[in-house]
Design a protein with these regions (language model features):
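N-terminal/domain-start segments enriched in small and hydrophobic, helix-friendly residues
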Residues: 27-56, 107-129, 180
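Acidic, Mg2+-coordinating phosphoryl-transfer loop and its flanking beta/alpha structural elements
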Residues: 128-172
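Substrate-recognition "cap/lid" segment bordering the active-site pocket of phosphatases
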Residues: 83-127, 135-141
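Short, charged, surface-exposed secondary-structure boundary motifs
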Residues: 112-115, 157-166, 180-182
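Active-site neighborhood of HAD-like aspartate-dependent phosphohydrolases
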Residues: 1-42
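Short, acidic loop-to-helix structural element flanking the phosphoryl-transfer center
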Residues: 37-39, 48-78, 84-91
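Residues at the starts of beta-strands that form the adenosine-phosphate
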Residues: 75-76, 125, 147
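Short acidic-hydrophobic, aromatic-tinged amphipathic segments that line or gate anion-handling sites
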Residues: 102-108, 168-176
Length: 188
């Protein structure tokens, strides 16, 4: 998502987007002046992207095949950090690339939402996959028994962000990650 968002900012607003692992407030600068985009404007731009540009997001290599394998042994829930107003567009965007699983919108740390999912579904084992280190920390705090895989499928972004200290493993390719996930889900 990040590279698609950055491409959109560049083409539509002449804003350079350089992801920063710990401070989203430092990620956007006006190309002509080098000045930071104000934080309130940043959130408006992000909302604007999700309102009109979600279709720019493309399928991550090997994701569809990996999810197909995982779906054979587990329920898949996509926990997306978007407001509820974007639920229908997120479902449509995922459906357009062949991903058809339950989608839940969330704002903030994902630990409470993961905890509720575990309470509601009572799985024997659960695996959480996310690109944001803070979400791994949140899940570790709320549900330490959940396996946590840090994955950043965008290679440009992956080079910028260190492995999440609260994740059990960092794998940035679904073709490799699926075996790690399946091992956790099917262990006795």
């Amino acid at each position: 998502m990040m590279s698609h968002f950055g491409d959109w900012l560049s083409s539509e607003y002449d804003i350079d987007f350089v992801p920063q692992p710990e401070d989203f407030g430092q990620t956007m600068r006006y190309r002509h002046s080098g000045e930071l985009v104000a934080k309130d404007k940043m959130w408006l731009l992000l909302d604007g992207f999700f309102k009109t540009e979600m279709h720019r997001q493309t399928l991550v290599p090997h994701a569809l095949e990996a999810l197909g394998r995982i779906d054979e042994v587990a329920d898949i829930v996509i926990l997306t950090n978007l407001g509820d107003q974007f639920h229908a567009s997120r479902v449509a965007q995922l459906d357009a690339v062949g991903i058809r699983h339950h989608v839940i919108c969330n704002l903030g740390g994902k630990g409470p939402a993961v905890s509720k999912l575990v309470d509601d579904r009572a799985p024997a084992r659960a695996v959480f996959v996310d690109d944001i280190p803070g979400h791994h920390r949140s899940v570790a705090e709320h549900r330490p028994e959940v396996w946590r895989l840090h994955m950043i499928a965008d290679p440009v972004i992956a080079r910028l962000i260190a492995p999440a200290p609260d994740a059990h493993k960092r794998i940035d390719d679904w073709a490799e990650a699926v075996d790690w996930i399946m091992d956790r889900l099917t262990q006795d």
